[in-house]
Every structure is written in structure tokens, then in C-alpha cells.
A protein has these predicted regions:
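N-terminal lobe/hinge region of extracytoplasmic solute-binding protein
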Residues: 49-102, 133, 211-215
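Structural transition elements
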Residues: 218, 303, 336-368, 384-389
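Detector for C-terminal structural segments
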Residues: 67-70, 224, 321-349, 385-395, ...
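Surface-exposed binding/hinge segments that line
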Residues: 110, 144-197
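Gly/Pro-rich hinge or "lid" segments in bacterial periplasmic/extracellular proteins
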Residues: 83-85, 182-242, 246, 359-360, ...
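Aromatic- and charge-enriched surface segment that lines or borders ligand/interaction sites
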Residues: 96-141, 165, 258-261, 308-310
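Ligand-site clamp/hinge motif
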Residues: 206, 234-280, 404-406
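A bilobed periplasmic-binding-protein/Venus flytrap-type ligand-binding module shared by bacterial periplasmic
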Residues: 83, 232-235, 292-317, 321, ...
């Protein structure tokens, strides 16, 4: 009996084992397959879509357009820079320290040791002196940023291997000169490479149009015009190799095309979407908006040479007539209220906004000035967004007080050519600071002697011009701020402008892009700080 039981038990165990084996085979062949993942983006490559058609040259001595300046800042270092995210504090870069001698015009810069250009050549005082002299000698459009201080080639001297002396032509508030050195013309180029590619005494300018010779975080790999600009990481960068190994700036002029590429994930950053498009994608999964007030403003210029505008009361009437709120609402986050010529974020910003839409007050001022029935005027504006829409609101506002406005939409090139010859009546334009200091705004808006905006609008006001000069040479910061407060209020009340709004930069990007912050200018953005997260999706 026990033997029989043992045999049956053995048979049962064999059957169970067979069943388990069959079940395991079945599971093996029918079990769910492990998911397959697809990487959505390369974390080492940053792709930006923007209109690059403005770029003329990537030579720091010639770069003066948005695209050119943005790229140059990735390729080169300067003596000083502005610290993000506020861009209000001037910090050392190539120069580790500096001092102004007692004469108030002689500056001594001590160069940081250990910095090398991308080809391994040491960056020293000779390179710094060569770069600044090169800007002065080439006399390109942006050179005025440095030559305005009376600099000549003889003004720059090498004291020793890591010390440079720069002697200005006159005393100036230290912050102004340092701010100007942060602009692209302050970039330090490699004399060895530049002179090796010199043609007919051009100091390598033709070669530098589409090559780089810097010590910055990136190196220019190629520039295919109307196609793309490609940068690769500088493995020898003295601050450390960027996490992004390649930056591709694609030429995509149409915002609609930028939007489609962003939504598909083919690009990381869409540089210039319209306000409507920004609103459209604001809540879309995988996309975020980076925004900050820019050092740029839109304004209405009134030519004092046009008889009605020679009367301050007429200019004031226009300021009271404009529907500022309607303009800002139309721009959907792309603008904020500003009525003085120094933008928020720049030293000397005056938050005063006394003007609002008051039709009755505007009509009364017109009548008092002798224009109870208004007059007819031409408003020049570019045909692009948002200028044409802002012009329409201004037209509607002014016609409500009896001023008939004929809008003339012309290309920016034609408009500015006429503007520079004082050939307008009303003009809708934008202006940004060439360097982040109030002097960069006070001179054009208040000093007609520099032949910029005040001169173009035929506003020859000696009080405003003298106040501008006084502020520029004031070393005491508190006194300088007081001068700019007085000047901004004076121009607000007496000047030939209606400041409409401060531009707010809004840039759409994929959520996998980290540490990207729009800078308030077009030349301080540092892409070496940006990185990308790896993002995957399950393949069906």
C-alpha cells in the first residue's frame, strides 16, 4: 500500500510539473513586451529658430544687429560684463580688477591670468590692447560706443603682460565707460589668428565675418546665410565646458513656422512668436514661456519743425489723448506701462506714469493752442506687427480729439532714412539702450547735439542737453541719480515724445530647456548657462 501511494504521488508530481512547465512557456511567449523608449531631444544640442536675416558680420568690431550681437557674445569674452539675472551689476570677466587714477581719465585694467583662446593661445594685455585699437582703427558703425570717450589708438598702452592702461579724452562717470566695455565692441579677439587671415590691411575683418577667434564658451563652426549658424562648445573654456555641446540657430523668419517647429519638438526655442501665438501656446503641455522687460521702448515722435508740434500744449494734448491701456492690452503681455525714457531695470528708472486717456483735457489743450478743430498729420510706421496695430490705436485716439491721422506704412529702412533727415511729422518707432546705462538713453532723447532722436524731432533744448552732459560726468552716484530724475521728468513734460510702453520679451521654449532667461538687451545673453533635460516617450 505505501508503495502504491508513493507511485501515485510521483505521478501527480510529474503531472503538476508538466502543467507548470507548460504555463511558464505560455507566459514566456505571451507576456507583455517591455516598453521601448524614444528620446525626444538630444540634451547636448540646443536648437533656436529666429530670423537671422539682419546679421551682416560676426566680427565683434562690426556686429551691430540683434543676431550678430547675440552670437558674438557666445564666442568672445570682454573685460567686464553684467551679471544675470538682473543685469544691473557690473562684474569682472577678462579683467579681474581695475582702478581709475586720480586724474579721472586714466584707467588701469588687471587681466586675469590663465585664460586661453580656443586655439590655446594665452589671452594677455597685448590681446586686449590689440582688440580695442582694432575697433578704433576699423571705424565701423558700432565703434562710436568706444570712440565717444575720445579714444584713439594712442590711448591704449600695454604696461606689462597682464596690465592695460586706457586713457579717456575726458572725465566720465565710471559706470558709463564700464557699461560700454560690456558691448560687443569690447570683445577680445586673438591677434595671432586675426592677423594670420588679414587681407589688404583689414585686420582680419573679412575672415571674422564667418569665423571666430575668441576665448568664449563656444566656437563658430559654420554660418550658412539664410540657413543656420552653428556653434560648438569650447572645450578649453576657462569657466568650464558648457553642458550644451552644440547650438544651432536656424533661420526661420516666419513666426508661424517657428510655432509649428516648436510644437513638433524640432526646435527648443522659438525666438519671435507674436503675442497671439504666445497666448495660444502658453498652456500647451511641453511648452513654457520665458519673459522679462527689455531695455527697449516704443514711442511716438513729434517733429517740432511741423508747426502744430512747435507748441508744447499740442504735444501735451497728444499725450493725454492716447489710449495707452488699449495698446498694452492688445500686446497681451508683450508690453508694460512706461512713460519716461529710462526703462525699468536700468539705473535711473523713473516709474512716473502721469498720462492716461483724457479726451476732454486733450481737446481743451488743443483749443488753447489755437486748434479747436484739430489739424491733419501724417504718421509714419513700419508695416510689421505690432507697429501697424499700435498705429491704428493712435489714429483712433487722435481722431477722437479732432486730429486727422494719415497712416503711412513704409519699410523700416525707408522710415529711418527719412527720420534721420527730419523728414517726418509723426513717427512710431522703438529705441533700445546700446549699453545698460542711463547715458545711453539720455543722449539720444535729450541732447540734440549728438544728432539722434532729439535732433531728428528738431527739439533743440539747451537745458535738457546740458543736464544730460552734467549727469554723464557726475561721479557721485546719488547726485547722478537726482540729475536723471530731473531730466526724465523734464523730457516727459516738455519733450517731443509720447512714450507708449516698455517692450516685454516673450520667448517660447520646450519645458526640457533649463536655466534659459531672456536678457533685457540683445547682446548679454549667455547660452553657456543653459542646459537640457533628457526626455523620453514610449514607442507604441
Amino acid at each position: 500500500m505505501p508503495q502504491l501511494l508513493g507511485g501515485r504521488l510521483k505521478d501527480v508530481l510529474i503531472v503538476v510539473l508538466v502543467i507548470l512547465l507548460i504555463a511558464s512557456w505560455g507566459y514566456f511567449f505571451t507576456r507583455p513586451k517591455p516598453p521601448t523608449y524614444k528620446r525626444l531631444t538630444d540634451p547636448e544640442v540646443l536648437v533656436i529658430a529666429m530670423d537671422t536675416s539682419d546679421a551682416v558680420s560676426l566680427d565683434p568690431a562690426r556686429a551691430y544687429e540683434l543676431t550678430s550681437c547675440l552670437v558674438v557674445n557666445q564666442l568672445y569674452d570682454k573685460l567686464v560684463d553684467f551679471a544675470p539675472p538682473d543685469y544691473t551689476e557690473i562684474v569682472p570677466e577678462v579683467a579681474e580688477s581695475w582702478e581709475v587714477l586720480p586724474d579721472g581719465v586714466t584707467w588701469v585694467f588687471h587681466i586675469r591670468k590663465g585664460i586661453k583662446f580656443a586655439d590655446g593661445t594665452p589671452l594677455n594685455a597685448t590681446a586686449v590692447a590689440f582688440s580695442i585699437k582694432r575697433v578704433i582703427k576699423l571705424k565701423q558703425a558700432a565703434s562710436w560706443v568706444l570712440t565717444q570717450f575720445g579714444l584713439t589708438e594712442d590711448s591704449i598702452k600695454v604696461i606689462d603682460e597682464y596690465t592695460v592702461q586706457i586713457k579717456l579724452g575726458y572725465k566720465v562717470a565710471p559706470r558709463i565707460f564700464l557699461s560700454c566695455l560690456s558691448f560687443t565692441v569690447g570683445a577680445i579677439v586673438n591677434p595671432k589668428e586675426v592677423l594670420a587671415h588679414q587681407k589688404n590691411g583689414d585686420l582680419g575683418s573679412e575672415w571674422l565675418t564667418d569665423h571666430s577667434a575668441g576665448s568664449g564658451p563656444f566656437i563658430l563652426e559654420k554660418w550658412e546665410r539664410e540657413s543656420e549658424i552653428v556653434l560648438v562648445a569650447n572645450e578649453k573654456y576657462w569657466k568650464g565646458t558648457p553642458r550644451i555641446k552644440k547650438v544651432i540657430i536656424k533661420h526661420v523668419p516666419e513666426p508661424t513656422d517657428q510655432l509649428l517647429l516648436l510644437e513638433k519638438g524640432d526646435i527648443d526655442i522659438a525666438w519671435s512668436l507674436t503675442s497671439d501665438q504666445i497666448e495660444e501656446v502658453r498652456e500647451k503641455p511641453g511648452i513654457k514661456i520665458a519673459s522679462r522687460p527689455a531695455f527697449q521702448k516704443a514711442y511716438l515722435g513729434m517733429n517740432v519743425g511741423f508747426k502744430p508740434f512747435s507748441d508744447e500744449r499740442v504735444r501735451d494734448a497728444i499725450r493725454w489723448a492716447i489710449d495707452y491701456d488699449a495698446i498694452i492690452k492688445m500686446l497681451k503681455g508683450g508690453a508694460k506701462k512706461l512713460q519716461t525714457f529710462i526703462e525699468e531695470g536700468i539705473l535711473g528708472y523713473n516709474p512716473a506714469t502721469p498720462y492716461y486717456r483724457d479726451v476732454n483735457k486733450a481737446k481743451a489743450l488743443l483749443a488753447e493752442a489755437g486748434y479747436p478743430n484739430g489739424f491733419e498729420v501724417e504718421l509714419m510706421a513700419p508695416p510689421s506687427y505690432p507697429a501697424r496695430d499700435v498705429a491704428a490705436i493712435i489714429k483712433s485716439s487722435l481722431e477722437e480729439i479732432g486730429i486727422k491721422v494719415n497712416i503711412r506704412l513704409v519699410t523700416a529702412a525707408e522710415m529711418y532714412e527719412k527720420y534721420r533727415k527730419q523728414g517726418h511729422q509723426l513717427i512710431l518707432a522703438e529705441w533700445g539702450a546700446d549699453y545698460p546705462d542711463p547715458d545711453a538713453l539720455a543722449k539720444p532723447f535729450a541732447d540734440y547735439r549728438v544728432k539722434q532722436l532729439a535732433w531728428r524731432n528738431m527739439w533743440y533744448d539747451d537745458y535738457a542737453a546740458n543736464l544730460t552732459e552734467q549727469a554723464a560726468v557726475e561721479f557721485d552716484l546719488s547726485k547722478r541719480l537726482a540729475l536723471y530724475k530731473e531730466l526724465t521728468e523734464y523730457v516727459l513734460d516738455k519733450g517731443p515724445y509720447a512714450i507708449l510702453y516698455q517692450v516685454v520679451n516673450q520667448i517660447a521654449l520646450r519645458t526640457w530647456v533649463e536655466n534659459f532667461e531672456p536678457d533685457p538687451t540683445f547682446f548679454l545673453l549667455d547660452l553657456s548657462r543653459v542646459y537640457k533635460e533628457s526626455v523620453y516617450e514610449v514607442v507604441p
